[in-house]
Amino acid sequence: MTEDKVTGTLVLAVFTAVLSSFQFGYDIGVINAPQQVIITHYRHVLGVSLDDRIAINNYALNSTEELPTSLGDPTPVSWAEEETMTSASLITMFWSLSVSSFAVGGMIASFFGGLLGDKLGRIKALLVANILSLVGALLMGFSKLGPSHILIISGRGISGLYCGLISGLIPMYIGEIAPTTLRGAIGALHQLAIVTGILISQIVGLDFILGNHELWHILLGLSAVPAILQCLLLFFCPESPRYLYIKLDEEAKAKKSLKRLRGSDDITKDITEMRKEREEASNEKKVSIIQLFTNASYRQPILVALMLHAAQQFSGINGIFYYSTSIFQTAGISQPVYATIGVGAVNTVFTAVSVFLVEKAGRRSLFLIGMSGMFVCAIFMSVGLVLLSKFPWMNYVSMTAIFLFVSFFEIGPGPIPWFMVAEFFSQGPRPAALAIAAFSNWTGNFIIALCFQYIADFCGPYVFFLLLVWSWPLFCSHFLKFQKPKENPLRKSQQSSERRGVQLKRQKLL
């Protein structure tokens, strides 16, 4: 059967597409390694360097002169303390904005990825989106020459807009060009490219490579390289045959695209499947985001999709490096950054493993195994951290639990939500479904980025256990009752919901 064939054109198209996913991961991880270097630069630009703050304290403690004030007569020490606290708060504010502006941009743009893909086509939409990527990279790359805090915040926000667009575009495109039997494995490559980008950003962010006072701006602007490469390669990639056939009704172009992707003239099965989907789509009105929740045919699939993304984000995976650093320091590792890179490497390896497992073990099974494993690891992490002061050897228990936590995440909860949404819906509601799912993911990302430190301060070592206790029932209540057939992953799930919707209507009429 030709549908199982992996052709050079398919490899080129998927590789080119997931360069966007790589940029996504790179932009997530690149800001972490040079944190202290960038904060030091912020102090210099804003005139509140560490040396200045020390000088203020020394002056306040040793001088007998009155310091100017408009708020009565505080002592020199209180004036200096207030000045120091204000300076520290200013730096913290700009650093927090530098990190979180990326997620804000992603939240805003996530609604428009599918819509842009429908308006311009998948290839042209990616070309247009790369304009944002290049602008963001250039702002960050030249941030050392101007007001760095403003340029980095702006660049991160614009890069977030780009990543928000592609978080809907890439799963849609690679899901539409992939052969049916390889759709899950190819869909998982989106997540693999993301974690690879995170790992590469951690490596090149080492202080002896680019994460130092001289080269940190180049580190931030380096995402322009995959953006330029993708722009060049996109001219050689075929447009989505599903988009051409179903959306534009251009059968000849769709067949040409399919023949390139399949490497054969025998495309009867693909055309038959798309023809059936087009007939069904022609009977469907344009589906809005609101209709996904009000229409019984779409309600359960979209709720499942949202819960999958919520469970992914609120599992605590994005906060894992907060505790890993302290644990590795406690274990006596002089350079905990290398241990963190080790976690990133495990992250990448097990994502690659999931690519091969997803078609054999099934989506639901892998998600269940992953969530169950993370739940157990969270317990061991919490126990290890609670007992660390009494039993120093418990740090090794926590270290092992962190590595296993990441491994279980990438077996299922990491990659599966991204491509499952494209499989749940037909061509009509798919763009709206991808938009709302991407928005859900970005919203969870932003909430964790903004609140994790406060939750960790309040809950201490129980933070991961608490997050998983919250996300587990969300997953169970929606995903366990959703039986997803294997034979037609693009339509069977929705048809099942449509039948239930018809049955509900009949019951109401009776």
UniProtKB/Swiss-Prot annotation:
Glycans are attached at residue 62. GO terms for biological process: D-glucose import; D-glucose transmembrane transport; dehydroascorbic acid transport; fructose transmembrane transport; galactose transmembrane transport. Residues 1-10, 118-122, 179-191, 237-301, 358-365, 422-431, 476-510 are cytoplasmic. Keywords: Cell membrane, Glycoprotein, Membrane, Sugar transport, Transmembrane, Transmembrane helix, Transport. Residues 32-96, 144-157, 213-215, 323-336, 387-400, 453-454 are extracellular. D-glucose binds at residues 191, 312-313, 318, 347, 410, 418. Belongs to the major facilitator superfamily. Sugar transporter (TC 2.A.1.1) family. Glucose transporter subfamily. This is Solute carrier family 2, facilitated glucose transporter member 2. It comes from Bos taurus (Bovine).
